[in-house]
């Protein structure tokens, strides 16, 4: 902050003492437009944060899929079973999620940034400039109200120096012009900014839907192919509501093994 700006800040800090309710400027139309803008600002900042989080989540999901697929592949790895004419369904699953990660998710990274993240970020950069304009308007309002208070006091209690009132009135006129120009500009342009949000974000919204559709469709298509390698009997048992019983039988067989009870003997 410059020295001049520092002095202005100190002066404004003392305005609250001299400004009475009768001096305060009230513009309900502006207040309404500022509230609408604040709603847009909060939504825009939240959208920027969540859009970045969405991209990170896609990466996290595929990374987790790959990790668990590697574990499952090792779990199913049985050379005797494979040598006997079987196959390692875990390997097919691992290859499936690896292909999904490299051929789908990584290809979506660029389009997601270009069509969703970048436009949202660019829109959000305007918030800082608008906040500065709103802050400046508030400062000019304080100056205007203080000038009104000064004139009111000189009218109520005339000074010995007769030139003080004309000077104060001139300062009031200047403060009024500065405030009203900025106030009217914000009242005109804030609604325009708010109304532009839908046509601006529409293409990004459409792109986000298409990216989600591609992610879900490709994932479903690839994973659906793994079903042909799953045990048909287990699939039939699940469809017929018998799978829980089968699992209980397998757990019973495991419990009957001596090695499962060695730790408690």
Curated annotation (Swiss-Prot):
Keywords: Coiled coil, Cytoplasm, Cytoskeleton. This is Reduced viability upon starvation protein 161. It comes from Saccharomyces cerevisiae (strain ATCC 204508 / S288c) (Baker's yeast). GO terms for biological process: actin cortical patch localization; actin cytoskeleton organization; actin filament organization; conjugation with cellular fusion; endocytosis; lipid tube assembly; plasma membrane tubulation; regulation of endocytosis. Mutations in this gene results in sensitivity to carbon, nitrogen and sulfur starvation. Gene3D superfamilies: Arfaptin homology (AH) domain/BAR domain (1.20.1270.60). It is found in: Cytoplasm, Cytoskeleton. Component of a cytoskeletal structure that is required for the formation of endocytic vesicles at the plasma membrane level. PANTHER family: BRIDGING INTEGRATOR 3. PROSITE patterns: BAR. One of its GO terms (molecular function) is cytoskeletal protein binding. One of its GO terms (cellular component) is actin cortical patch. InterPro entries: AH/BAR_dom_sf (IPR027267), BAR_dom (IPR004148), BIN3/RVS161-like (IPR046982), Rvs161/Hob3_BAR (IPR037429). Disulfide bonds: none annotated.
């Amino acid at each position: 902050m410059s020295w001049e700006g520092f002095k202005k800040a100190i002066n404004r800090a003392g305005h609250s003492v001299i400004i009475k309710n009768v001096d305060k400027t009230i513009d309900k139309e502006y207040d309404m437009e500022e509230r609408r803008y604040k709603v847009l600002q909060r939504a825009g900042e939240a959208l920027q944060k969540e859009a970045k989080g969405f991209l990170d989540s896609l990466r996290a999901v595929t990374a987790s899929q790959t990790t668990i697929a590697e574990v499952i592949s090792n779990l199913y790895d049985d050379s005797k079973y494979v040598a006997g004419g079987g196959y390692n369904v875990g390997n097919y699953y691992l290859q499936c999620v690896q292909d999904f990660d490299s051929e789908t998710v990584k290809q979506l990274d660029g389009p997601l940034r270009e069509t969703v993240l970048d436009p949202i970020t660019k829109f959000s950069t305007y918030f800082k400039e608008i906040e500065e304009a709103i802050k400046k308007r508030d400062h000019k309002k304080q100056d205007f109200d203080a000038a009104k208070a000064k004139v009111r006091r000189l009218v109520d209690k005339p000074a010995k120096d007769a030139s003080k009132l004309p000077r104060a009135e001139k300062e009031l006129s200047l403060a009024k012009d500065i405030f009203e120009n900025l106030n009217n500009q914000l009242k005109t342009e804030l609604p325009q900014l708010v109304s532009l949000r839908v046509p601006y974000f529409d293409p990004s919204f459409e792109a986000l839907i298409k990216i989600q559709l591609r992610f879900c469709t490709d994932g479903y298509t690839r994973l659906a192919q793994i079903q042909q390698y799953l045990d048909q009997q287990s699939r039939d048992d699940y469809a017929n509501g018998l799978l829980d019983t089968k699992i209980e039988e397998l757990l019973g067989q495991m419990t009957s093994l001596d090695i499962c009870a060695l730790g408690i003997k």
